[in-house]
Amino acid sequence: MEKHGNYDIKKICVIGLGYIGLPTASMLANHGYEVVGVDVNEKRVNHIKNGELKIEEPGLLTLVKGAINSKNLNVQTSAEEADAFIICVPTPALENEDGSKKCDLTYVMSAVQAIIPFLKDGNLIVVESTIPPETTKKIYETINKKIYVAHCPERVLPGKILKELVENDRIIGGINKKSAEMAKEIYKSFVEGKIYITDSNTAEMVKLMENTYRDINIALANEFAKICDEIGVNVWDAIKIANKHPRVNILNPGPGVGGHCISIDPWFIVEKTNNAKFIRAARELNDNMPAYVCKSVLSELNKLGIEKPKISIFGATYKGNVEDTRESPSKNVIKMLLENGATVSTFDPHADCFEYPLSTLDECISGSDCIVVLTDHDAFKNIKKDDIDEICPKLKNKIVFDTKNILEHNLWKKAGFKVKLLGNGAW
């Protein structure tokens, strides 16, 4: 195999074959590298070998099959010698006693330990996992070899992963310039966006800043929603008009923030400093939105004389049109509804796996007092009059609580529903 660019990197070992690792490994294999994909989950490895992906992502199955059929991608449960190693494992958050959270580096450091026996002088390690500042240097310091280490944080959106892997700009921070340049050589094989070179601390901080910026702006929208609920203003109408200002772009409110990035990453800044009070306040506000939704739903039902209701949850995933339920606000909304005596059924046309039982649509709505929309799936947006007419006879009470403002409310109202919208103080 011919070498790529200025550095003799021919073989790459990708550790972690989840939402980021598998697309990255497959992309590299389809661009001429010899790639070994490693995951400790044997069932996942076997599924990949058999072309049975548990990740719902446009184009991914075709990409993976192409990589495997080309013989450039092999997947297995253990690492082996390579010229470069890319770590794509989760970095979950651990909760502290005060309710704050910190980064759990267990998976990252386990991946490092797994590749140490196979490292040779001159090898490169790239960490794609989101990590707190100074972690890349910490990894380098744990390895007693003359190697190169860089951080190239993933920046893709579920549902558009393959498109964004290619088109998005990337940032690469190295422990030294050569580390960053070596990593750039790998990524420029398929990245069409610009690749920016910096130091590892800056790269770590940039990724956290990106997601913190979004989290804070969502928190602002959620706070506006709570205020508008209180004073009788429709927050969605107010936001739409406010955004007519050329320098204003308020985001939409919702039942909370989910996914493995935005709801987690700001805590990695908070754990490093006492100067992140604003960031922490925003994170706590968003974390408390499921409780606010639960309280609002039960309060409105109580006003109508409905106690211990059966509630139909529409949406288990953290965002629309994906199967990913990680950190989904739906989990906490359901948990709190159950704790307050409600009976809950959940329907999601995309999710296969969830902490609570998933029902068919008919099972979910049978005998229901209230439908609560928590996820903006197209399947929910596209509910039309005929669909509503089919739903009506199966319900006990015609009540809808829309936290995403995606339903055609007039259709539901014409069918006799009471429709409550998050951030609108009146029915």
Curated annotation (Swiss-Prot):
Q: Which reaction is the catalytic activity of this chain?
A: UDP-N-acetyl-alpha-D-mannosamine + 2 NAD(+) + H2O = UDP-N-acetyl-alpha-D-mannosaminouronate + 2 NADH + 3 H(+)
- Spell out the InterPro entries in the cross-references: 6-PGluconate_DH-like_C_sf, NAD(P)-bd_dom_sf, UDP-Glc/GDP-Man, UDP-Glc/GDP-Man_DH_C, UDP-Glc/GDP-Man_DH_C_sf, UDP-Glc/GDP-Man_DH_dimer, UDP-Glc/GDP-Man_DH_N, UDP_ManNAc/GlcNAc_DH
Known EC number: 1.1.1.336
What are the alphabetically sorted keywords of the record?
Answer: NAD, Oxidoreductase
Q: Which residues bind NAD(+)?
A: 19-20, 39, 44, 91, 130, 326
Active-site residues are 207 (proton donor/acceptor), 261 (nucleophile)
Family matches, as SMART domains: UDPG_MGDP_dh_C (SM00984)
Top-rank lineage group of the source organism: Archaea
Keyword match NAD: yes
Q: Which Pfam families match?
A: UDPG_MGDP_dh (PF00984), UDPG_MGDP_dh_C (PF03720), UDPG_MGDP_dh_N (PF03721)
What is one Gene Ontology biological process annotated in the Swiss-Prot or TrEMBL record? Answer: polysaccharide biosynthetic process
Q: Enumerate the GO terms in the molecular function aspect.
A: NAD binding; oxidoreductase activity, acting on the CH-CH group of donors, NAD or NADP as acceptor; UDP-N-acetyl-D-mannosamine dehydrogenase activity
Q: What class of enzyme is it?
A: oxidoreductase
Q: Binding residues for UDP-N-acetyl-alpha-D-mannosaminouronate, per the UniProt record? A: 155-156, 207, 211, 214, 245, 247, 258, 318-319, 404
What NCBIfam families does the database record attribute to this sequence? NDP-sugDHase
Q: What PANTHER family is this protein classified in? A: UDP-N-ACETYL-D-MANNOSAMINE DEHYDROGENASE
Family label: Belongs to the UDP-glucose/GDP-mannose dehydrogenase family.
Summarize the subunit comment.
Homotetramer; probably dimer of dimers.
User: Main role?
Assistant: Catalyzes the four-electron oxidation of UDP-N-acetyl-D-mannosamine (UDP-ManNAc), reducing NAD(+) and releasing UDP-N-acetylmannosaminuronic acid (UDP-ManNAcA).
Q: What is this protein called?
A: UDP-N-acetyl-D-mannosamine dehydrogenase
User: Organism source for this protein?
Assistant: Methanococcus maripaludis (strain C7 / ATCC BAA-1331)
Gene that produces this protein: wecC
